[in-house]
Design a protein with these regions (language model features):
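Active-site acidic/histidine clusters and adjacent loop/turn architecture
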Residues: 1-54
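Intrinsic-disorder/low-complexity coil detector
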Residues: 35, 50-51, 60-62, 87, ...
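Active-site-adjacent substructure of cysteine-protease-like catalytic cores
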Residues: 46-75
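Catalytic cores and adjacent binding grooves of peptidoglycan-active enzymes
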Residues: 67-199
Length: 199
């Protein structure tokens, strides 16, 4: 078995990394992203992408979150994130519980939902419904406990302020149609900003 060396990493980067361009934003990433990004951008020709792409991040050397020995797809340049502020990664079960309650969405349906248009509607519904008046009217013990936890409340307030799935839905659909995997469709944790090459 070959031993990994710094030279291997340098060779991988030299062989696979190129300058990517997406809606006027530039980022280094894997050469296999060129075609799907171009295809998605061409699919948007004549449309106004709203909200516009304000952040495009790709190559970030780091392990997969929660691990120390497995490189993330970002470390390999095979994944990118778009507009993270309004498209967060949601991992905490309590966040899903409150989002479901505030929007009247079935919790299990929310976790399993893969349709960008439906998730975008849930995002807007949460922004509209998660208010002080709604929070003060809650009586369910798990919801109350979540709302009283400072860290949880700060995250929820951020979701209400910025949204959870605010990317232009036709753009998400175009990126998926171009063969990319969307993190917003994952059932265990949703990463609405995240797109990656299929393995």
């Amino acid at each position: 078995m070959a031993k990994a060396t710094a030279f291997d990493a340098a060779e991988y980067l030299d062989t696979n990394m190129v300058r990517l361009t997406f809606f006027g934003r530039h980022q280094d990433g894997h050469r296999d992203l060129v075609a799907p990004l171009r295809q998605a951008e061409e699919a948007m020709a004549g449309q106004t992408v709203s909200p516009p792409i304000t952040s495009f991040g790709c190559l970030v050397p780091r392990p997969i979150r929660g691990t120390t020995n497995r490189l993330s797809n970002h470390a390999l340049g095979r994944a990118f994130d778009l507009n993270p502020t309004g498209n967060p990664r949601i991992t905490q079960a309590v966040d899903y519980l409150v989002i479901a309650a505030a929007t009247g969405t079935d919790l299990h349906q929310l976790r399993r939902e893969t349709d960008p248009a439906t998730l975008s509607r849930i995002s807007r519904a949460f922004q509209d419904s998660f208010t002080e008046a709604w929070a003060s009217s809650q009586t369910e013990p798990n919801i109350l406990a979540a709302l009283q936890n400072r860290g949880v409340r700060e995250r929820l307030n951020g979701y209400a302020r910025h949204g959870i799935c605010t990317l232009y839905v036709p753009l998400i659909q175009a990126l998926i149609a171009a063969g990319l995997v969307w993190g917003g469709a994952w059932p265990s944790s949703k990463d609405f900003m995240h797109f990656e090459l299929r393995r």
